[in-house]
């Protein structure tokens, strides 16, 4: 469901974004969107947006720019320094954007920001292609 009007302090005020994509502390989606590989990182954002399209990413970025709040982008949440979180800011969690398009002729792939190494391997394997990647499939990938 997409809603066209939002509270004034919502990431959705910047444009059309589903209210179901904006998550606040205490919700399971907020917890999932702030979970990191490095458990020592203690940054606590104000909200998480889990977009499924470029338009929703743009809306979240416009909101952050208009309000001056910090933004962090979370792919797989595997960064050792915890840069996927911004204290008091907005996390754009790309985990729902996991598309991988393989161009066999050029042996390249277009990889969405929420894709993992396992997603890339699974997409290239049917074509006999092997991407340069580590051994843990849960690590985020984008290129």
Q: Model-found features: residue ranges?
A:
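N-terminal accessory segments
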Residues: 1-143
């Amino acid at each position: 469901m997409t809603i066209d009007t939002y509270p004034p302090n919502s990431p959705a005020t910047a444009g059309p974004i589903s209210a179901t994509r904006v998550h606040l502390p205490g919700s399971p989606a907020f917890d999932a969107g702030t979970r990191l590989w490095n458990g020592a990182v203690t940054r606590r954002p104000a909200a998480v947006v889990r977009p499924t399209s470029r338009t929703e990413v743009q809306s979240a970025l416009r909101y952050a720019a208009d309000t001056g709040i910090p933004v962090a982008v979370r792919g797989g949440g595997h960064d050792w320094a915890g840069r996927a979180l911004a204290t008091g800011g907005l996390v754009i969690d790309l985990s729902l954007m996991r598309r991988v398009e393989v161009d066999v002729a050029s042996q390249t792939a277009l990889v969405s920001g929420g894709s993992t190494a396992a997603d890339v391997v699974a997409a290239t394997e049917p074509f006999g292609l092997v991407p340069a990647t580590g051994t843990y499939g849960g690590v985020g990938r984008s290129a």
